[in-house]
Regions:
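N-terminal secretory signal peptides that target proteins for export/translocation
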Residues: 1-7
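Sec-dependent signal peptide recognition
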Residues: 8-16
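C-terminal motif of bacterial Sec signal peptides marking the signal peptidase cleavage site
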Residues: 20-22
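Bacterial signal peptide processing site
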Residues: 24-26
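Short glycine/threonine-rich turn/loop motifs
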Residues: 33-181, 271-406, 411-414, 421-422, ...
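Extended surface/linker regions that mediate inter-domain or inter-protein docking
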Residues: 62-67, 194-327, 332-333, 364, ...
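Axial heme c-ligation environment in periplasmic c-type cytochrome domains
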Residues: 88-92, 152, 158-209, 241-248, ...
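C-terminal capping alpha-helices of c-type cytochrome domains
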Residues: 188-215, 249-270, 362-377, 384-389, ...
Length: 468
């Protein structure tokens, strides 16, 4: 029989589709489906999980609550501290993981004698109870500095050090504040003399490195000498023979290597987010609501949304940083005392006598890949760019940014939503299109990255004083 206007084929097609639908019906009517349709607000108006590829489909928690897509679960897992790789070696520091060096470095870290006024130690600016920051907008030592104190938790996983990356190893960074006039203000000869004149320090040092240049103890030897600092110190330094200067530099570098050995032990610990991620990784849902509340989960969803917030472009991996340098519009072009950021740091690291390729490094040339293949200076995007910090322990590491300009995390996010009209030709920001509620949710999530040991009660009880 001939069809009329294609009606018969149409009816046949409907019958086939109906049969296929019946065959797909679960045998147990009340069994929970593997995936479920989403509310329009979850993935777009009118969308359902059935219309999306499997990796984008959201599974259900017991009770019908929408959870995460496979893609989102992978993103969450990648941020978990469980994914943190093993402590990386430092080929430029042969005693980096020697327990004797760790203890020597710990003692020096907390010792105020390594400052010109004998009142300031490394721990003055790197307080254990504040995740090894100081709570100030800009660090203050002998005088006022121009930058915020970076935290030290997880510092051993970094490639570049200080906000502009002007040091390429943890030990080269460790000796920098010792001689900085506004920080500790001591000369390298005074550092070596302090080690040599203390019986315990001297014994510990010589067990690791051999004999100290004990001529620094002679009454006629210049008391204060080093290439940096005041004119007196610089003049006295130039008066020393080349061989003596080299021996002092070796001892000074060894002090830095010992401090670095201690700082390498400052590894991150899990926060509430990490426990939540662990629960998800094990396929569990029952404890989720006890780990992160509704707003914190919403903030996490925003954080990993590569289209809406793009946070993961810079803050990725278990330390929530790509270890790179970016211009986020915090520079003021043409202002007095402008901070040039990374472009100046590139020049400085090449000139540093303690860099990986220098004679005081323990590394073979082939091991200095970061320095050897570092992009040259003059890159436009390096102007006003600063290192991307870790987001871990944000609750106790404010104020924020390289100059501590933002007192609160909410102020940072507001800056990202409405960047100031400064340096617009250079900064990399695309303003966040977030509501006030979403901004608060994002901030709520970021606070879950703080470790339990830095909570109010633990800090009050003094449970975070590393090694003390």
């Amino acid at each position: 029989m001939a069809s009329i206007g294609g009606v018969r084929p149409f009816l046949l097609l409907c019958w086939v589709l109906l049969l296929a639908s019946a065959c797909a019906t679960p045998a147990v009517p009340d069994a929970a489906p593997a995936v479920a349709s989403l509310a329009p607000s979850a993935i777009g108006q009118g969308s359902t999980s059935a219309t999306l590829p499997r990796m984008f489909q959201r599974t259900l928690q017991p009770g019908g609550m929408v959870a995460w897509t496979e893609q989102e679960l992978r993103a969450i897992r990648s941020l978990s501290i469980a994914e943190l790789p093993a402590l990386p070696p430092d080929p430029s520091n042969r005693i980096a993981d020697d327990s004797r060096a760790i203890e020597l470095g710990r003692l020096i870290f907390f010792d105020t004698r390594f400052s010109v006024n004998r009142k300031i130690s490394c721990a003055t600016c790197h307080r254990p109870d504040l995740a090894f920051t100081d709570g100030l907008a800009k660090a203050r030592g002998i005088g006022q500095t121009r930058r915020n104190t970076p935290g030290l938790i997880g510092v051993a996983w970094q490639t570049w050090f200080l906000w502009d990356g002007r040091r390429d190893s943890l030990w080269a960074q460790a000796v920098t504040p010792l001689e900085a006039p506004q920080e500790m203000g001591i000369s390298r000869v005074e550092v070596v003399r302090t080690i040599a004149s203390d019986a315990d320090y001297r014994k510990r040092y010589e067990q690791l490195f051999g004999a100290l240049p004990i001529e620094t103890l002679d009454a006629e030897f210049p008391h204060r000498a080093g290439p940096f600092g005041d004119a007196v110190a610089a003049t006295q330094w130039r008066s020393l023979a080349d061989g003596i200067r080299r021996r002092i530099n070796i001892a000074f570098a060894n002090v830095g290597k010992s401090i670095a050995a201690f700082e390498r032990t400052l590894a991150p610990a899990p926060g509430r987010f990490d426990r939540y991620a662990e629960t998800l990784a094990k396929g569990g849902f029952g404890a989720d609501s006890q780990l992160l509340d509704t707003d914190e989960v919403a903030g996490l969803r925003l954080f990993i949304d590569i289209d809406k917030t793009r946070c993961l472009n810079c803050h990725n991996g278990p330390l929530f940083t790509n270890h790179d340098f970016h211009n986020t519009g915090t520079g003021v072009r043409g202002s007095a005392g402008v901070d040039w950021g990374r472009i100046a740091g590139i020049a400085d690291v090449w000139q540093d006598e303690f860099n990986c390729l220098g004679e005081y490094s323990d590394a073979a040339r082939a091991a200095c890949t970061a320095l050897r293949f570092m992009p040259g200076s003059g890159q436009r995007h390096d102007v006003g760019a600063f290192k991307v910090p870790s987001l871990r322990n944000l609750s106790v590491t404010g104020p924020y940014m390289h100059d501590g300009r933002f007192a609160t995390l909410e102020a940072v996010l507001e800056h990202y939503r409405s960047p100031a009209e400064l340096n617009l030709a250079l900064h990399e920001l695309t303003p966040l299109d977030l509501t006030d509620t979403e901004l608060k949710q994002l901030a709520r999530f970021l606070h879950t990255l703080t470790e339990r040991r830095f909570g109010p009660e633990e800090r009050r009880m003094g449970k975070t004083s590393a090694g003390k």
